[in-house]
Amino acid sequence: MSLAPIPSDDPKEQLETAEPESGDPKDERVQLATASQRQLIWMRFRRHKMAMIGLWILILMYFVAALAGFFAPFTTNSAHSTHAYHPPQLPKFSISDGFYVHPSEGRTDIDTLKRVFEEDTSEKVELGFFVKGEPYKLFGVIESDRHFFGPKEMGERFYLFGADRAGADVLSKLIYGSQVSLSIGLVGVAISLVLGLILGGISGYFGGWVDNLIQRFIELIMSIPTLPLWLGLAAAIPPTFGIVPTYLMITVILSLLGWTSLARVIRGRLLQTRDEDFVLAARLDGVSTARIIRRHLLPSFMSHIIATVSLSVPAMILAETSLSFLGLGMRAPAISWGVLLQDAQSVKTVATAPWLLIPGIAVVLAVVAYNFVGDGLRDSADPYGKRSE
């Protein structure tokens, strides 16, 4: 009876015994031996199935958000009050007409006093790809009137995800809202990352009274309840502020508390590694303090930084959505997922128009995808971590 080999924690031995994905095992070992740190991280990340799924979901979401005007069937200002709370329409297909839907006319039911829409089966609204529709500016510069999918005739309406109380297309507003909700997480985390790296790096590398001062400041910020502080600062934003100033203010507010955990992680790791031999050798070689931290110390615990940052993005997306949902974040006419969810605050409204909760599904999907990617990056950047299957 043969015994199974005991797995080793040595990263070099893990690379030597790694199973190749395809091709000659010897060529794979040579590739692993000569690969850079980024290449090794990417090789391990590709084996993490859920992380790859999350990555493709995020790529698709950001791609659609970047080209919102093209993918949205209508612009954000396009609304028809007679189509308020129009239910979602499922496209039909025929060989002669292609994709189409039947137009609907709304009326108020006398018995239930509910808004009811009845299809006119004698008429058809033909749908197509790359159709000419309402004009828009791509990236705010390029003028175009082509839409990925929508009615072939100008003026006709089609509601794949239904309509809101103003009669605007929920799908179009969902796509435009992703620009704010998805970008505010990245911008906010970028600000938090810079603050965390600078203050955490100074605190952990120099120590002494500088460390005590920075840590007491961090503890003071962390002792303040997060949600009440966010609510107070967001409520202080004047309602007369424009969309861009409000966006910047909300981003800064969300970043004020996001950097503390990252700074403490960096500080703790620097305290452990600042007296290592390779750091002493760099000092004797005349390397500057900034270069020692950037090139020698930070890469040694990059997995912790990646994990903290990747988990901070969905937290900021949820924070922006919560503030906007409560009316303290982005406000109309600005569009974000939180602003769209304001229409779903009433139980009566949700009961009659459940499709208004679709922006909430988008929030959950983005948060879960970010968590999957964060787990995959953390495991891939840790050479002593267990290889993901």
Model-derived features: where do they sit?
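Gly/Trp-centered helix-boundary motif
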Residues: M1-L193, L197, I293, P333-A334, ...
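Alpha-helical transmembrane segments of integral membrane proteins
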Residues: A163-E389
